[in-house]
UniProtKB/Swiss-Prot annotation:
PROSITE patterns in the cross-refs: CB, TYR_RECOMBINASE
Record-given protein name: Virulence plasmid integrase pGP7-D
Domain Tyr recombinase: 127-303
Residues of the Core-binding (CB) domain: 13-99
Organism: Chlamydia muridarum (strain MoPn / Nigg)
GO BP field: DNA integration; DNA recombination; establishment of integrated proviral latency; symbiont entry into host cell; viral genome integration into host DNA
Amino acid sequence: MNSKFYHRSRLFLTFGEASEIWLSTLSPLTRKNYASGIKFLVSLKVLDLTKTLDNAISFDHSESLFKIKSLTIFNGKPVSEASKQARAACYISFTKFLYRLTKGYINPAIPLKDFGNTTFFKIRDRVKTVSISKKEWTVFFEALRLVSYRDYLIGKLIVQGIRKLDEILSLCMEDLFFASNQISFRIKKRQNKEINIPITFPFSLMKELKDYVGGRNGRVFISEDGSPIATSQVVHNFKIAALRSAMTTKITPRVLRASALIHLKQMGLRDEEIMRVSCLSSKQSLCSYVCSGGNSSVANIPTIL
């Protein structure tokens, strides 16, 4: 089939069909956020999922972006600037995908940079995440161990490995290397690409993990019935442990990771090393935490538990 005709034929896909293809290429968390963004754009009548892509050839993207950024109230609730920028980012990312999908028949949206009408601008310098000290997370882990030994191990991996919760819940037995005290984390990047981040953990933590998994196969962390763990289960047990340990701070997986990042920075670990193991994209991203409170080589993080 003629290549040009093949890519033109994709113009007869509906926006709904194209969005499903696009979302399937994204990491789980990004997919969830952008799926919500697509629903928002449909509600705002920026997108009509029943129409075919050939309608997008004549789209005035600047008008669509202006409509998104001009919104002040949605469903009776105020719309924050952060929310508007997130929806605009979703729209731009989707049109870039359509550009690739149709090999240029549909032009991608370009962020507006007109004075007073800029699509993206810095809202805040710091990530709105509280943090706790090493002493506090030690007390928290003692309580969490009694609530759920499984989630106690998850929490310690978050802190020592500077990992996100979904990266830990997706671990399988073949990712554990007890002989070398290493765990290999699969990190989803854009375009459905994946990199491996091998991290060395303290022997004591790996021994606890080895005793927990025994001789099982499949996922490392599972529910009592053997099914995958929902993030809400972990968050719930964290909440119980925080109450039992009389913590005044709400402890979430995000708070633990942010606390570990700040602690490593305070220890004097180089920014480049922290960025490499945490997968933060820039020093600016790292600074937003520390100011608030392919394959990779093996990362040796100082023991901070």
